[in-house]
Amino acid sequence: MTKQKVCPVCGSTEFIYDPERGEIVCARCGYVIEENIIDMGPEWRAFDASQREKRSRTGAPESILLHDKGLSTDIGIDRSLTGLMREKMYRLRKWQSRLRVSDAAERNLAFALSELDRITAQLKLPKHVEEEAARLYREAVRKGLIRGRSIESVIAACVYAACRLLKVPRTLDEISDIARVEKKEIGRSYRFIARNLNLTPKKLFVKPTDYVNKFADELGLSEKVRRRAIEILEEAYRRGLTSGKSPAGLVAAALYIASLLEGEKRTQREVAEVARVTEVTVRNRYKELVEKLGIKVPIT
């Protein structure tokens, strides 16, 4: 039998709940009976049954980064359990873990998403890039595009595609190094996925200028050099010199030229290492830009 609340001031048993303040007050004298009450109800409002059904939820939100989208539950650990019960719960947890990835498709998805987590963490990519890569991979699985390709190459290709879609500057070489997959293999998977998921060149286009700050930071170049490099790249783009060229190679050459023009010289080897391209690539792009744009580089 529950004891009825009584106001200690006036003896009234009538109370008012104020949800905004989290208080229960006496309806007669206004004395605060309880305060700091946590509202366990929903944070939304519904005006009919259908709205209530749509807006109601329980548990944690779904996550595309988990193979089961976070919809399963885990059997917890209680150290106060006796030996036999603890052993029983251990077995249950073990079986539950197996059942969560009970078939090959689930196991492959779980492995792919763990690999995605590793790659994006090491590349220090933002969460929205990781989520976009996961979405692309799930779509590729749904369309049967994984067959005949390694999971590692496809997940790496999805990371590269996500970076390009969201204009986050990362080169194929960087992703290849972290993914531990040959650059050519990732490139093949990337082109295949882009073609079959309708990722058009327009969607995937990354302006070479997006890479300028990234490379300039590593080379320790000033804002003046960066601005000059961007000017060179924008002029090259206007004249149609960037089509079909690697953004990394173009940026490396533009930064090399800008560093010479602004008196902050960096060697071709230095810029090539930062851009993860060969010195030959830097040299070829350098010659093209200087000749086609009529840039007079000081002789050093």
From Swiss-Prot:
Q: Which GO terms describe its biological process?
A: transcription preinitiation complex assembly
- Start-end of the sequence repeats? 114-197, 210-291
GO cellular component labels: transcription preinitiation complex
Q: What Gene3D superfamilies does its record include? A: 1.10.472.170, Cyclin-like (1.10.472.10)
Q: Which GO terms describe its molecular function?
A: DNA-binding transcription factor activity; TBP-class protein binding; zinc ion binding
Residues noted as binding Zn(2+) in the record, renumbered to the chain? 7, 10, 26, 29
> Could you say which residue ranges form the zinc fingers (TFIIB-type)?
2-34
Specify the domain of life of the species encoding this protein: Archaea
The record ties this protein, via PROSITE patterns, to: TFIIB, ZF_TFIIB
Q: Which Pfam families match?
A: TFIIB (PF00382), Zn_Ribbon_TF (PF08271)
Q: Where are the transmembrane segments?
A: none
Q: Which UniProt keywords apply?
A: Metal-binding, Repeat, Transcription, Transcription regulation, Zinc, Zinc-finger
- PANTHER family annotated for this entry? TRANSCRIPTION INITIATION FACTOR IIB, TRANSCRIPTION INITIATION FACTOR IIB-RELATED
Task: Give the protein family.
Answer: Belongs to the TFIIB family.
Q: What does this protein do?
A: Stabilizes TBP binding to an archaeal box-A promoter. Also responsible for recruiting RNA polymerase II to the pre-initiation complex (DNA-TBP-TFIIB).
UniProt protein name: Transcription initiation factor IIB
Protein's gene: tfb
